[in-house]
Regions:
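Solenoid-repeat scaffolds in large eukaryotic assemblies
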Residues: 54-55, 74
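Glycine-centered helix-coil hinge/cap
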Residues: 21-23
Length: 146
């Protein structure tokens, strides 16, 4: 499938987009996270009910928002869902062929968000501990040598 060959996120394009958005980047990223969770929930629910029509809008939304963050693999998955669902609506078919693609959507979204979060705040990816933080010491039992 095409989406499996796509990069998760094109970091070069993302750096360009991030520079253009400036201070608004983090706010827009938080909207993407919220909207993405809603879209995936709607897609999964539409798939459970085998409703091709209900797949189109959230897949279209997720496709566009993913593309804005250069998340090509997620955008390709969403595009596959959207286009197949549109065809199913036109042909009066159920979207059963999309089951594997829909199942792959949530893990891809989670992986994408983790990468975008690391990119947005590289300090958060550091190990806990260090200056200003307590480092958990090994628990020693009272009166016993370590």
């Amino acid at each position: 499938m095409l989406h499996q060959q796509s990069d998760l996120v094109d970091l070069t394009e993302l750096a360009r987009a991030r520079a253009e958005l400036g201070a608004a980047y983090l706010r827009i990223l938080s909207y993407f996270k919220e909207d993405g969770v809603k879209s995936i929930h709607e897609i999964e629910e539409a798939m459970r009910t085998r409703n091709a029509t209900a797949l189109v809008r959230p897949a279209h939304t997720l496709k566009g928002e993913s593309a804005q963050f250069c998340a090509h693999r997620l955008s390709a998955l969403a595009e596959t869902i959207e286009m197949t669902a549109r065809r199913c609506v036109e042909m009066h078919e159920t979207p059963d062929e999309l089951i594997e693609t829909v199942v792959a959507l949530r893990p891809c979204f989670s992986e994408t968000i983790a990468l975008l979060d690391r990119d947005a705040n590289p300090l958060a990816a550091r190990r806990p501990g260090g200056f200003g933080r307590r480092v958990a010491a090994p628990q020693a039992s009272f009166g016993r040598a370590g």
